[in-house]
UniProtKB/Swiss-Prot annotation:
Positions of post-translational N-acetylproline modification: 3
Cofactor: Mg(2+)
Acetylation keyword on record: yes
Gene: rbcL
TM annotation in the entry: none
The protein's name in its UniProt record: Ribulose bisphosphate carboxylase large chain
Length: 481
């Protein structure tokens, strides 16, 4: 028995229940550069002080339990415990607080998003003392970031592989998402790629169903890729969804994609799980495959403002786990996404260093220490009239993905792709010439449509389509000030 242990046990064990705040609320604590920092939106039960609620979160997500235990004396709680070091009221919300918690790095397994999430959010969200709890942000310290591979390749390597620079990349999700035979599916892929798109995509729930087994889909899509490349002289790709019921089957599908020589595959990282995703990201790095990530199931976790996990946290977790693309909303389309919040986590995906900025929902300064960046994918209810806004909002390092906005063209799939490519090239040229895309966007599209009948037809079809709904997840009043 060590002298330290002897000293602790000799004091004697006092059983019972004590307030969490006596041990885990430490307002004088100075955070360390190696700490993982978390910002929780806490809604306590009536009668529970915010300090007790914040301390309970720190305790239950680190070393604490509901009662004092004898084995507390066999370790150093001061070394391993989480600490609630600051609490602030959320203005404009009744009984809501932001509780800041610091976790020592030794609590977490190196290179494991699974372990990090199991610790921080694995159990505490069901705690009875809280009416609701939401993880708003995490600060991942460089010491922990360096234990992860991260994205298989990153933005610059992807551009070099594709030999495409100076503009956003264009994609399309094949529709209908379910029901097509593999041959008809491959035909749609070919027509879209031939028309000018860089990528086409499996939808998130396209795996290996009776109407289209995965191997058949992979073969017909590979044929479409090679045929369109030969005709256009451009490198093309299709996001072949390797998501499967087991990790072994997922990697088997990824291996087959590698044998076909295609440039990119896909994974549903939340439904597939972080362990599977990290394994697939390592495989892609080793075998030269790009990895597209779909965030299916994210809104179950992140949409409600007072409970769950904000998508900026899921985005950071994906950058650690690994992916070269990830869906990030559109701001202007059919899916949830306020502009400033979206731009905040888009920067967290792409940039090496992001300053704290509460006006964009960023609670902590994040240093990625050269971990490769991830391309945000704008997808969901977008069409050619949205192109100026999308180009302005997301910039060059992004993928703009039009499903119905390509395949819904009245003349067919290839003309739909042509319309999108013409609209994009017109917006990029106008921006480079100094025009303001936000102000002049509609006139830019109208001018381009005069010499592109495909674009003119698309403009006519979607001229009145809008999705005018307010976002559920918005900035707090104190963040807007």
């Amino acid at each position: 028995m060590s002298p330290q242990t002897e000293t602790k046990t000799s004091v004697g064990f006092k059983a019972g229940v004590k307030d969490y705040k006596l041990t885990y609320y430490t307002p004088d604590y100075e955070t360390k550069p190696t700490d993982i920092l978390a910002a929780f939106r806490v809604t306590p039960q009536p009668g529970v002080p915010p300090e007790e609620a914040g301390a309970a979160v720190a305790a239950e997500s680190s070393t604490g339990t509901w009662t004092t235990v004898w084995t507390d004396g066999l370790t150093s709680l001061d070394r391993y415990k989480g600490r609630c070091y600051h609490i602030e009221r959320v203005f404009g919300e009744k009984d809501q607080y932001i509780a800041y918690v610091a976790y020592p790095l030794d609590l977490f397994e190196e290179g494991s998003v699974t372990n990090m999430f199991t610790s921080i959010v694995g159990n505490v969200f069901g705690f009875k003392a809280l009416r609701a709890l939401r993880l708003e942000d995490l600060r991942i310290p460089p010491a922990y970031t360096k234990t992860f591979q991260g994205p298989p390749h990153g933005i610059q390597v992807e551009r070099d592989k594709l030999n495409k620079y100076g503009r956003p990349l264009l994609g399309c999700t094949i529709k209908p998402k379910l029901g097509l035979s593999a041959k008809n599916y491959g035909r749609a892929v070919y027509e879209c790629l031939r028309g000018g798109l860089d990528f086409t995509k499996d939808d998130e729930n396209v795996n290996s169903q009776p109407f289209m087994r995965w191997r058949d889909r992979f073969l017909f899509c590979a044929e479409a890729i090679y045929k369109s490349q030969a005709e256009t002289g451009e490198i093309k790709g299709h996001y072949l969804n390797a998501t499967a019921g087991t990790c072994e089957e997922m990697l088997r599908r990824a291996c087959f994609a590698k044998e076909l020589g295609v440039p990119i595959i896909m994974h549903d990282y939340l439904t597939g799980g972080f362990t599977a995703n990290t394994s697939l990201a390592h495989f892609c790095r080793e075998n030269g495959l790009l990895l597209h990530i779909h965030r299916a199931m994210h809104a179950v976790i992140d949409r409600q403002k007072n409970h769950g996990i904000h998508f900026r946290v899921l985005a950071k977790a994906l950058r650690l786990s690994g992916g070269d693309h990830i869906h990030a909303g559109t701001v202007v389309g059919k899916l949830e996404g306020e502009r400033e919040i979206t731009l905040g986590f888009v920067d967290l995906l792409r940039d090496n260093f992001v300053e704290k900025d509460r006006s964009r929902g960023i609670y902590f300064t994040q240093d990625w220490v050269s971990l490769p960046g991830v391309l945000p994918v704008a997808s969901g209810g977008i069409h050619v009239w949205h192109m100026p806004a999308l180009t302005d909002i997301f910039g060059d390092d992004s993928v703009l993905q039009f499903g119905g906005g390509t395949l819904g063209h009245p003349w067919g799939n290839a003309p739909g792709a042509v319309a999108n490519r013409v609209a994009l090239e017109a917006c990029v040229q106008a921006r480079n010439e100094g025009l303001n895309l936000a102000q002049d966007g509609n006139s830019i599209i109208r001018q381009a449509s005069k010499w592109s009948p495909e674009l003119a037809a698309a403009c006519e079809v979607w001229k009145e389509i809008q999705f005018n709904f307010k976002s559920v997840d918005t900035l707090d009043l104190n963040e807007i000030k």
